[in-house]
Amino acid sequence: MIDLSTLTTERRNNETFNLDQMTVAEALIKMNNEDKKVAFAVEEALPNIEPVISSAIEAFNKGGRLIYMGAGTSGRLGVLDAAECVPTFGVPATQVIGLIAGGDKAMTVSVEGAEDSLELGRQDLIDLKLNENDLVLGIAASGRTPYVIGALDYAKEIGAKTASLSCNLNAEISKHAEFPIEVDCGPEFLTGSTRLKSGTAQKLILNMISTISMIGIGKVYNNLMVDVKPTNEKLVERSKRIIMQATDCTYEEAEEKFIEADQDVKLAIVMLLTDCAAEEGKTKLVRANGFVKNTLN
């Protein structure tokens, strides 16, 4: 049994002992100062984040999935990051998946006891038909959530890659993952409230993992999200701007190719850059494994 009082995320913050006596302005300054520490803490963890991204790219190239698992705030952040990959990078909802202890209901309300079940984490991956091509990333600010540990142990059993993300050093979940990430943000502004600095650190790291792994499989050209899915009016206009930025064409030219490409931004860009029709552009992209740059050779 882990003594929770020894965890950094459970310790009291010396800077905020008199929090209830501060003015709103004083509390804001203190909270902002604490938040400033997060990016520097994440910077210290960069060497351990890199192999997780490399593993995610490898998983995608083999047809595997990136699966986030967590409870409470940690689980919600995983679900959020996974959901954003669909419109941003044009991947199917089955490629990056967020699982939260207690299921969809736990996104909005607490599901008692769910995070304390080793078996539930295991069962959720069984239900997902986890295979050896997948990467499972267990997220737990405390670093000791049984739901996450059960999932990581099952993933290792079947030969899937495993990674963990904790906001405590020497975390228990680090012992259960091939690629552990530990980020020390110090005690929380409000004692034990890991939705604060810990949650911010987790979101920054998940942003890195999903975004840079997508770059690694050709979802980005220069710094443009060329596989964006235009699911609303704002994204339709953004898609046209992306085509213009990538090719230096006019708005009218971008709109024309966007329509010819059946609203496929990447295809429209290739059509303009290589002066080809839609079908030839599709062939070029297949040969280039989806990388726009490789269609220009």
UniProtKB/Swiss-Prot annotation:
One of its GO terms (molecular function) is carbon-oxygen lyase activity. Its EC number is 4.2.1.126. One of its GO terms (biological process) is amino sugar catabolic process. It catalyses: N-acetyl-D-muramate 6-phosphate + H2O = N-acetyl-D-glucosamine 6-phosphate + (R)-lactate. CDD domains: SIS_Etherase (cd05007). Keywords: Carbohydrate metabolism, Lyase. Residues 56-219 form the SIS domain. Gene3D superfamilies: 1.10.8.1080, Glucose-6-phosphate isomerase like protein, domain 1. A lyase-type mechanism (elimination/hydration) is suggested for the cleavage of the lactyl ether bond of MurNAc 6-phosphate, with the formation of an alpha,beta-unsaturated aldehyde intermediate with (E)-stereochemistry, followed by the syn addition of water to give product. Belongs to the GCKR-like family. MurNAc-6-P etherase subfamily. Homodimer. This is N-acetylmuramic acid 6-phosphate etherase.
